[in-house]
């Protein structure tokens, strides 16, 4: 970590420490909250959408959008890896959708605002063209026709639009396949659009003039389309190449448009794009961890010797460029990987390499935060990563990793990490060298640290390890299901033996969002939500449940707040009651039988908050802008303790709360 970070944290601490006094309660001195900024512990590069096209200097550049707040449209010199241009996309957080028009104009479609942006040749700032389809918050992929009109696939209503580059007029082609909320992939060819869907794998052909939708039959061997995803799709030379998988390798099916038949299947293809057809008629793609050339005429693959390692190996852009380098004469294959690396290969010399470009690192939203004996742990959303933070100075050691859903320092000092996707559980020893072969390997021979302990997708179909708690030396994991499913799980992992007890649908059709424990009993808060926001629930309210770990049975479950969809967090208070939060309501239950003891409506929204406890009080996040303190006692009432925008609330010991707001981390000192 650069020394500048700790220096910055110290300066911020000196300038911006805020002291707040909570309202006094009768007979007590009011506790004081001192909010201390600790900086931004997580930053990295995440590239999703990209293309290879003319750059700002007229020469071929690699274009990618780096995720952040805001996201940036970047042009990279493929010969040097230098940044040629970095233009913010105001309001956009990232992009799966980047494409170039025939005249060199670059377009990008973003999430979570669903806007379309345009960068004209020679410009250094983008034009925000707005949300083409009101209510569609993701533009998942875009493509262009010969005239430069832009077509895009959207979420949450699975629509396709056309943006007329000359007039700005937008045509709404409507939902392409009923019941499919995502047009996950799209490409244009000869007056037709070819699309693929999610959560189920359907293929469609759309006539751009008439809007007529024709369904394409599934390829042989694909099986049931349910819970499969048409993750990417490219049309090259009259054939549609489409991968049915996830971010990981899967079959690439080849559909011949003229004969309307499936003509080939390429196994273990990584996506996210394949190259245009080269001068020799070949197409370059990443298959089985190697850059290979595919010959459409003979349906053969030829290796290049350029291999890839790590968990994520797909191309975030791929094309051709003249590099004018000694080992790279003529035209070379160039592209980018998800963490900002460039790969390149020269067909004449066989020379290849992978190196880090100079794309800017962006701060990462903190998704998980936990206090430890000597450190604070922060885990990142989307870009991912785990940072170990000095609680006094804010100095952070960043480690590149997966998206982190939950963190826990156990009593023996081991840090457990709940990851997305595949609801993976890892153990990390902070005293040893970090080495993740999937994301950030250490020196050769370094043992894996963190170590993967569980992957809960293959057998019980889970995707998010969202909650962690230690119970009698074991680790309880609460999860959210994968894909268009309902029904999370409670998993009890024993570090001593490596055994795991897995209880799917511990509460029927509900996901497990929060966990706490007392005396060998695990208590959980659940949500009616499933794996996708489009998954229709079967129940009307979140629950709280109790599970006896030794007896391996559920003791009770209850609905504490009728109509509240999610009980997002639970904790045991200093009064021995089981406290929880469901949207705007905080409540206390008897841990023995789940009987409601206390309830307070404090907020105005249904935003999910956290609830934590010290030996003196319970602290609860309401409306993501207020933190209330509830002292023990049947007559005590919640008092406003801190008013500050935030996203997560944690605790470290008895006198520190932890608060996050986007990428920013704060320590809240509790004193009297």
Regions found by a protein language model. Name each.
Residues 38-44, 86-91, 130-135, 174-179, ...:
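Surface loop/turn motifs at the tips and blade-to-blade linkers of beta-strand repeat domains
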Residues 38-72, 93-96:
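Beta-strand-rich domains and repeat architectures in extracellular enzymes and scaffolds
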Residues 44-53, 92-99, 136-143, 180-187, ...:
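Repeated scaffold domains used in trafficking and secretory/extracellular systems
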Residues 61-64, 105-108, 149-152, 192-195, ...:
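Conserved beta-propeller blade signature
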Residues 68, 112, 156, 199, ...:
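Residue-level signature of beta-propeller blades and closely related beta-rich strand-turn architectures
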Residues 77-81, 120-124, 164-168, 207-211, ...:
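Short loop/turn segments that connect beta-strands within beta-propeller blades
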Residues 477-487, 525-541:
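Short, conserved, GDST-rich strand-edge loop motifs in beta-rich repeat architectures
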Residues 641-672:
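Blade-level signature of beta-propeller repeat domains, shared across WD40, Kelch, NHL, RCC1
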